[in-house]
Amino acid sequence: MERFGGAGYEVAAAELSRQQERHYRLLSELQELVKALPSSCQQRLSYTTLSDLALALLDGTVFEIVQGLLEIQHLTEKNLYSQRLKLHSEHRGLKQELFHRHKEAQQCCRPHNLPLLRAAQQREMEAVEQRIREEQRMMDEKIVLELDQKVIDQQSTLEKAGVSGFYITTNPQELTLQMNLLELIRKLQQKESESEKAFS
């Protein structure tokens, strides 16, 4: 029984040693990647922050979370872009239809009524253009709000996952730092993936 307990201890010690080696390797790679960031950002990423980040990355779960968040973000951006293109296309169609309707009306109009018709058509065109501008502004506001919500969701998810540096904020400096941390995680994930392929 004593020998079995000793073997369990050796396995646990070996696992701990592997985890420490992986932590050190991740930390070293993070320190290398940080050198490519602007100096203002480098100063904000202390050894402790990078060490905590390396610890959070140990089991690979955070890599999967970040990958999932990026996929959701790309799908959201693609969907919002499609919605904006659709609105733009509808507006273009509306203006073309109005232009053709006005042209037909002018061709059927008696010459002495033409100035009145053109003035009415000008007012109608201005009203349509105002409506188009308003709808585009509303669409752009909707896009910004939806993207802001995605950022909050990402911050919350990564904070709950225990990733150092992530919490809900709208502070531009903190957002820049979080974006840089995400970029570090993404680059480290690529390196990990490439090294796994090399050994397989």
UniProtKB/Swiss-Prot annotation:
Coiled-coil annotated spans: 116-146, 176-198
Record key words, sorted: Coiled coil
Top-level taxon in the UniProt lineage: Eukaryota
Signal peptide location: none
Membrane-spanning segments: none
Family the entry assigns: Belongs to the gonadal family.
Record-given protein name: Protein DGCR6
Biological source species: Gallus gallus
